[in-house]
């Protein structure tokens, strides 16, 4: 029951996004939509002094942004949730 409700809700959200995308004539629509959904501006290509989520890093060098940590296993910055 919960799974079917989740799938129905996900389908409605997908239908809304596709409908909104079909009405939009701007080329940067996907970037704007993702920026609004996640409330971040990582898509503009701005230079910053730290590495964000998914950027490659070297463990132990503290290159990742605050609230992120370099994964020893995957060698990229992940969100640090603490222990």
Swiss-Prot record:
Expressed by the venom gland. Residues 22-48 form a propeptide. The presence of a 'disulfide through disulfide knot' structurally defines this protein as a knottin. Belongs to the neurotoxin 10 (Hwtx-1) family. 15 (Hntx-3) subfamily. GO terms for cellular component: extracellular region; host cell presynaptic membrane. Its main location: secreted. It comes from Cyriopagopus hainanus (Chinese bird spider). Lethal neurotoxin. Selectively blocks tetrodotoxin-sensitive voltage-gated sodium channels (Nav). Does not affect tetrodotoxin-resistant voltage-gated sodium channels or calcium channels. Disulfide bonds join 50-65, 57-70, 64-77. This is Mu-theraphotoxin-Hhn2c. It is found in: Secreted. Residues 1-21 form the signal peptide. The modification Leucine amide is found at residue 81. It holds the Pfam family Toxin_12. It comes from the Eukaryota. Monomer. GO terms for molecular function: ion channel inhibitor activity; sodium channel regulator activity; toxin activity. Keywords: Amidation, Disulfide bond, Ion channel impairing toxin, Knottin, Neurotoxin, Presynaptic neurotoxin, Secreted, Signal, Toxin, Voltage-gated sodium channel impairing toxin. InterPro entries: Huwentoxin-1, Huwentoxin_CS1.
